[in-house]
Regions:
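Extended active-site and interfacial segments that coordinate phosphate-rich ligands
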Residues: 111-126, 136, 290-294, 303, ...
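Acidic, serine/threonine- and proline-rich low-complexity intrinsically disordered segments
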Residues: 399, 432-517, 530-706, 745-809
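Conserved helicase core region in the C-terminal RecA-like lobe
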Residues: 102-103, 270-274, 291, 506-524
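P-loop NTPase motor module signature
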Residues: 1-423, 483, 538, 722
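Charge-dense polyanion-binding interfaces
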Residues: 121-122, 250, 254, 426-447, ...
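Short, isolated positions in well-ordered beta-strands
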Residues: 181, 518, 714-716
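C-terminal accessory/binding modules appended to enzymatic or scaffolding proteins
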Residues: 686-748
């Protein structure tokens, strides 16, 4: 084993660990950094205490532990053990623990000093998983505040040294060049006219015909693996084994894919990107890389995750190609044009930038950090995702201000997804706890194919679910209890209230309580049910509606009875346009879904009035009784605000009046419950109520409703919003006046509409003096003949005004 590439840098690495709290190691997959180096570190006297080795994937963790134990001629659980979500294999003599990501976070939270631990190794850090970034942030905090003697080794196949060195400028960097054989990299774009599965199968079969050795085929997801496997089966010989490899497979099935092919056989391993770096797959000489991957993208707007298929980064293509050169010179066929490969992103985007951060936020709050920016990150968590995480934790009752509530502390202690943790801590007795634990186990590892009915899955007794539920019950300190299907709905509803769904139409479409759309296949048996709880959703790429992956049909009346806290009751009084009156309803709602609507017999006077006000807002002010007097008062107030701005006039534009209906109109609405009643309201008096006595006097003085002309006649002034005020008066009543009268403290002259004895306009003037001296002559000449009994003097500016004819003058 000393011939492994990493052995060449062992001395340098040990010296670095002796001198520095953090060390960076860059070594390709297969260099021995996971399956040999930890044992050398275990024997190093400079490491005081246990070693914790973090492996991001369960299969890798178990394989690494198995391999390390074999090198010691032991079984896992002796010197070397492992811990993962549903499996623990450690003993009293265990000094090296291989753990998965969530397990390491739990260890740090339960014992922040990591008592008895001398070294933590973060393996495959280049994958930049969310949990690895969190673990690094927590460990750096531990080193800074609690354990300056704790050592941290960050290992990676393609270490992003520049970023890490900026973050850890004092950390030594140790580089192992590794050992690999030349790999011929070929490029072949897939035909546009051919289905992806068929084209990949054809290219893979052709590679097998032309070349010897076993082959590793990279595909984006499980669906493609299964379809390509089916296509390949008819294109290969009997000496070729087809071995799928992806995370959801059982550990035994995964091991079949990584072990060497039997003597005289070849194998094709059809894998997701799980096989890029974290696993050593025996016997591979050929690689076919479809150059695609499926990644999860969280949408903070909807709170859902979308799976997208995208081109892999150049770093991933290099890693995939490298798999062909571990044993001998190999060949990698990238199913993409070389020009496209060269335009691909250099590195993959870190999970922390595109993930649901509710679990991370809960972990940070449990750690005592309410501001994530206080921690050390390679990439800061996006603010918008943190806000979405905070909203979810608030909905689950996990927050009290900026800290965890008592319930939130219980949730965080479990180490589960926040929704599942909320469901688990809500259990009030052993049976509820057993039921919640089984639901959580199913939702953590949902069935891959087939029935989308959660109730059907719950009825099965799969060993993995049973094992996980027992582990969760142990965390809850529950020893007994029976899982009961009748308890599923109320338990789910507490954690997934926003995902209660009601059918809309007959084509499998539903609306969620949060307002989003969701859909089932129209042929799915669940689509016959009006109400569902859909805890497992996936945001579609082709449709705005989410896809329901797993759901439970519910009796909504029973659910409301058992979970009354879900329901918001609102009494609504609405305007009935057809009748011109009000109608009252009581609505029971879960989020935006209406559960039940029933007539309300006796709504309160306040509710009736509020409904009337709402109706006015909906229809606008025209439904009110705007008499000429009321309209003129409103115009006077609008003009007063422009002409006398130094006074505090009320705003009476449409928007302001609608916004203040409760102030000026409501006091006059006693007993008004219909459109007819509205039409009877005195709007003039209601508007006058906006002014105190002093302002009423000022308005009547400065912008009067009427003007008294020299003859004593009291004539209404016509106010306009965009034109000057006007006074329509018979010409004879303005004799003796040299200028136009003014209002608003003399600032605004009245436009005079001078009328004939028959009340018809003769002249409109803004300059009475100029009119008497000029155009009046033409008017005089014409009017003398038409109205000889009326006075038409030669000098009107100096003639006494009159309302009479000559006979009475």
């Amino acid at each position: 084993m000393s011939s492994l590439p990493v052995a060449a840098v062992l001395s340098e690495l040990l010296t670095a660990l002796d001198c520095a709290p953090q060390v960076l190691l860059s070594a390709p997959t297969g260099a021995g950094k996971s399956t040999w180096l930890p044992l050398q570190l275990l024997a190093h006297p400079g490491i005081n205490g246990k070693i914790i080795l973090l492996e991001p994937r369960r299969l890798a963790a178990r394989n690494v532990a198995q391999r390390l134990a074999e090198l010691l001629n032991e079984k896992p659980g002796d010197t070397v053990g492992y811990r993962m979500r549903a499996q623990n294999c450690v003993g009293p003599n265990t000094r090296l623990e291989v753990v998965t990501e969530g397990v390491l976070t739990r260890m740090i939270q339960r014992d922040p000093e990591l008592s008895g631990v001398g070294l933590v190794i973060l393996d495959e850090f280049h994958e930049r998983s969310l949990q690895a970034d969190l673990a690094l942030a927590l460990l750096l905090d531990v080193q800074q505040g609690l354990r300056d003697d704790l050592k941290l080794l960050i290992m990676s196949a393609t270490l992003d040294n520049d970023r890490l060195q900026q973050m850890l400028p004092e950390a030594p960097v140790v580089i192992s060049e590794g050992r690999s054989f030349p790999v011929e990299r070929r490029y072949l774009p897939l035909p546009a006219h051919q289905r992806f599965d068929d084209a990949v199968a054809v290219a893979t079969a052709e590679m097998l015909r032309q070349e010897s050795g076993s082959l590793l085929l990279f595909l984006p997801g499980v669906g493609e693996i299964q379809r390509v496997q089916e296509q390949l089966a008819s294109r290969i010989g009997s000496d070729v084994l087809l071995c799928p490899l992806y995370g959801a497979l059982s550990l035994n099935d995964q091991r079949k894919a990584i072990l060497p092919a039997p003597q005289g056989m070849r194998k094709v391993v059809l894998a997701t990107n799980i096989a890029e770096t974290s696993l050593t797959i025996e016997g591979i000489r050929l690689v076919v890389d479809c150059a695609q991957e499926r990644v999860a993208r969280f949408d903070p707007r909807t709170g859902l995750t979308r799976l997208i298929t995208q081109r892999v980064s150049q770093a991933s293509m290099t890693q995939r190609a490298g798999r062909a050169g571990r044993l001998e010179p190999g060949i990698c066929l990238h199913l993409i044009a070389k020009e496209q490969a060269e335009r691909a992103a250099a590195q993959s985007e870190p999970e922390i930038l595109q993930s649901d951060l509710s679990g991370l936020l809960m972990e940070l709050l449990q750690w005592g950090c309410s501001d994530p920016a206080q921690m050390s990150w390679l990439d800061q968590p996006p603010t918008v995702n943190l806000l979405a995480a905070k909203r979810l934790l608030q909905m689950l009752g996990a927050l009290e201000g900026e800290r965890l509530s008592a319930q939130g502390q219980k949730m965080a202690a479990l180490g589960n997804d926040p929704r599942l943790a909320a469901m688990l801590v809500s259990a009030k007795n052993d049976d509820e706890a057993a039921t919640a634990a089984k639901i959580a186990a199913i939702l953590e590892e949902p069935p891959r194919m087939g029935n989308s009915d959660l109730g059907v899955a719950f009825s099965r007794n799969q060993p993995a679910w049973q094992q996980r539920s027992q582990q969760l019950l142990k965390r809850l300190n529950v020893r007994g209890g029976e899982a009961d299907s009748s308890l599923i709905a109320p338990l789910l509803a507490g954690a997934f209230a926003d995902r209660i769904a009601r059918r809309r139409g007959q084509d499998g479409r539903y609306q969620l309580a949060n307002g989003m759309g969701a859909m089932l296949d129209a042929n799915d048996a669940l689509s016959r049910h009006e109400w569902l709880i859909a805890p497992l959703l996936l945001q579609g790429s082709a449709s705005p509606d989410a896809r329901i992956l797993l759901a439970l049909p519910v009796d909504i009346d029973e659910l409301v009875q058992r979970c009354p806290q879900l329901v918001q009751q609102s009494d609504t009084v609405e305007w009935d346009d057809a009748q011109g009156t009000l109608k009252a309803w009581r609505r029971l709602q879960i989020g935006l879904l209406t559960v039940k609507v029933q007539p309300l017999a006796k709504p309160s006077e306040d509710e009736l009035h509020q409904a009337m006000l709402n109706g006015i807002c909906d229809k606008d002010l025209s439904v009110l009784n705007w008499t000429a007097e009321a309209e003129q008062l409103r115009l006077r107030l609008l003009c007063a605000a422009k002409w006398l701005p130094e006074y505090d006039w009320p705003a009476v534009d449409d928007e302001s009046l609608l916004a203040t209906l409760e102030t000026w109109l409501l006091p006059h609405m006693t007993g008004v419950h219909s459109l007819r009643g509205l039409k009877s309201l005195d709007i003039y008096q209601a508007l006058r109520g906006l002014l105190d006595w002093g302002m009423q006097q000022r308005l009547d003085s400065e912008l009067p409703a009427h003007y008294t002309v020299p003859t004593g006649s009291r004539i209404a002034i016509r106010y306009h919003e965009d034109n000057p005020p006007a006074l329509a008066v018979r010409m004879q009543e303005m004799f003796g006046e040299a200028t136009n009268p003014t209002i608003a403290q003399g600032r605004v002259p009245l436009v005079l509409e001078l009328l004939s004895p028959a009340q018809r306009p003769l002249q409109i003037t803004r300059d009475l003096s100029a009119f008497w001296k000029g155009a009046y002559r033409e008017v005089q000449k014409e009017m003398k003949g038409r109205y000889p009994k009326h006075v038409w003097p030669d000098d009107p500016a100096n003639t006494a005004p009159t309302r009479r004819t000559k006979k009475y003058s």
